[in-house]
């Protein structure tokens, strides 16, 4: 049964750990190449067009952006709460090396130290085989010990006859099991319910993997 979104709102932008939202609300982070469609995905998941600003300019997100979402896993259930964190996109060449290094350090600090982080959604463009940056990102996320969910976006840009092969290519390149990558299209609404089911499962999983090095 589809998740029902009760409310969603932008919380804040942060660049340093002291600025991160406080509290115990479970969090899921979203990461992918610049212009892969993160903002469109967040707007589709939160059922609020324009909540996350969509830009035609790659590399626009230069800080962590947090959004609070209340949802019901079933119509009769009490609302539950989850927080989404939009991470800066990777692979954008038109920024300085210094700026890219700053983004990388900011993201690494977040992934390593954020206690309430339950999983990371890695977003890849289904129209193309995963890039070296995508493969490296998947390996890096696994090395942190975080749970990784993969979504193949922009499926609407592909003919339906090519979608299955595109999904298999994503799963093969990222060493995923068959059916592990969620096909997604913000335009068609494809994959919204399937991805929400995995998000809700991760958000309520108290046994989610701890980050590598936690407790050391």
From Swiss-Prot:
Q: Which GO terms describe its cellular component?
A: cytosol
Cofactor(s) of this protein:
Mg(2+)
Query: What's an example Gene Ontology biological process for this entry?
Result: division septum assembly
A single Pfam family it belongs to is: MMR_HSR1
Protein's name according to its UniProt entry: Probable GTP-binding protein EngB
Which keywords describe this protein according to UniProt? Answer: Cell cycle, Cell division, GTP-binding, Magnesium, Metal-binding, Nucleotide-binding, Septation
Q: Which InterPro entries match?
A: G_ENGB_dom, GTP-bd, GTP-bd_ribosome_bio_YsxC, P-loop_NTPase
Q: Which domain of life is it from?
A: Bacteria
Binding-site positions, GTP: 32-39, 59-63, 86-89, 153-156, 184-186
As for family, the record states: Belongs to the TRAFAC class TrmE-Era-EngA-EngB-Septin-like GTPase superfamily. EngB GTPase family.
Record domain EngB-type G: where:
24-205
Residues noted as binding Mg(2+) in the record, renumbered to the chain? 39, 61
Task: Give the function comment from the record.
Answer: Necessary for normal cell division and for the maintenance of normal septation.
- Organism per entry: Anaeromyxobacter sp. (strain Fw109-5)
Please provide, alphabetically and separated by semicolons, the GO molecular function terms listed in this UniProt record: GTP binding; metal ion binding
